[in-house]
Each structure stands twice: as structure tokens, then as C-alpha cells.
Amino acid sequence: MIKYIVKKLLLLIPVLIGITFLSFAMMRLAGGDAVTYMYENAGAAVSQEVIDDTRKEYGLDQPFLVQYAKWFTGMATGDMGMSYVSKRDVYDTFIEKLPATILLTLSSVLLTMLISIPLGILSAVKHNRLIDYLIRFFSFIGNSMPNFFAALVLMYFLSIRLGWFPVITTDNKALSLVLPTLTLAISMASKYTRQVRATILEELNKDYVKGARARGVRGSVIIWKNVMKSSMLTIITLLALSIGSLLGGTTIVETIFMWDGVGKMAVDAITMRDYPIIQAYVAWMAIIYVVVNLITDIIYHYLDPRVRLGGDQA
């Protein structure tokens, strides 16, 4: 166990180097000058000499590889640099935005599971009946709907027409959280309902279920004590995928609802060419996916000892 965890964490180093190097290179290849844009955005007319001095101050006059090496060394020691726009420490900025993203992640995942697991089970149990067709139909509609479209529809009906919730984030965090949570849950619950249904159907056709039915065991007992236990690995995989992607920040949803999380922070940084913020966001995405996958593997191992850490079957 310890050996496997150490191996996975060591794997994070080349992953971080590869991903951050590529993003570093792509930002430079995208063209434009961060310093020039910074002054233009501030509405300040400055001379070329001031621009050159600022570039030197930020180390942007140095060769690409030198810039990257300095940034990566700083990140490894906890120094992510300073934002070009806000002039604040990148680490402090990131920590400030992270709680909002964590809150949105937890609420969205919780609502998704509360919707998708019962509906997936109901659809499987009522296989090829009216309720099954209805659940599959609405799951298809929800899965086909882009997040931005769902956000605009919810915003129009629940905010503009009915006035139940604020259009964008306000000081009332509880009310402001509802629409972005619903937006994310619609898409995820639609997709996961279909996957839960497929998993439950597969389990219901296995011999141990048929044997339990033949012995007169009630259907609800079979579902909750036997089938659900065997389906937990699939559900955990869904949770891991959701948490990993959401903790990276749901850029579109956070931007539409002005939810002040790391996703919106990344969009603002890209717009402003705030390289240190962008690089910190990319590094965070890489770290969170490796860590979430590691935790998922460990949970797999404890739920089903036949699964060896490393992915092999015992």
C-alpha cells in the first residue's frame, strides 16, 4: 500500500513537468505581450522604456527555458509568483478562490448522486416500462444540453421570470449557489443515471440475483443489500470523475453566474494574460487528477480486496 502511494505521488513529478511545460509554451506561442496588455487594460499610456523595465522586472526578457525553470523551481518551493494584474501573491489568490469551488463541487456532486442513483435504479427495475422510457428520454435531453444553455434556461425562468434566485452571485451565498448547482447537476445526473441503470441491469441478470429471487428474497432487499454493493465501484468511479473535474473549476458555469471560484479566476487570467495565475491553475488541475485517481484506487482496494493496487485482479 505505502509503496504504491509513494509510486503514484512520484509519478506526479513528470506529469506536472509535462503539463506545465506544454501550457507554458502554448501561452508564449499564443502571441501578444502580457506587460503591454496589462498597461492597456489599466488605461495607462506608458513609454516603451517603461514596458521594457516591467518585462525585465517580471523576468519576461529572459529565454523561455530560463523562465520555465525559475517558475517550476519556485512552485516546488511554494512560491508561485505574483499576479501581473492584482499584484498579489498567486498562492494567496488561489487559496482565496478555492473554497467557492469546493462548495460548488460538493453541492453539485451531492445533488447529482441524489438524483442519478434512485432514478438509475428505478429505470433498471422498471426495465422497458413507461417510467423507464421517460427516465431515459429526459436523461438523453439533459445529457445533450450544453452547460451554458442549461444555465441560460435556468437563469431566464427561475431568475428573470419567477425572481426566485439572483441572476449572478450576490452576498446571499445560499441563494446564489442554487442555479450553478442545478446547472451542473442536470448534465451530470443525466449522464450518470444512464450509467447507473446499465450497471444495475447487468447485476440483475447475474446468477446470484436469480438465485435470491428463487429463494423468495424481496426485490428491495436484493437491490440494496446485494446489487448496490456490487455496483459501488461504478458509483465511486462516477464520483471520482465528477470531483476531479469540478475541483478544477467549472469555467463556463462560474463565469456565467459570476461565481468567484478557481474556474472564473482562470478565465479572467487568460483574458488578462496573467501568466502566473494560469500556470498555477494548470498545476492545480494536474495535481487534483492524480490525487483523486490515487484515492479512488485505494477505495477500490478496500471495497473489493480482489482488486490489487495497480489495477490488476487478484
Protein language model features and the residues they cover:
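Alpha-helical transmembrane segments of integral membrane proteins
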Residues: 2-3, 94, 98-131, 170-314
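Transmembrane helix irregularities
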Residues: 30, 142-145, 247
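Hydrophobic alpha-helical transmembrane segments of membrane transport/permease proteins
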Residues: 16-66, 163-179
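Membrane-water interface segments at transmembrane-helix boundaries in multipass membrane proteins
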Residues: 87, 136-198, 271
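Cytoplasmic-entry segments and transmembrane alpha-helices of multi-pass inner-membrane transporters
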Residues: 2-7, 11, 118-154, 233
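An internal, D/E-rich "acidic patch" concept
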Residues: 60-117
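Hydrophobic alpha-helical transmembrane segments of multi-pass integral membrane proteins
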Residues: 21, 106-110, 149-154, 283
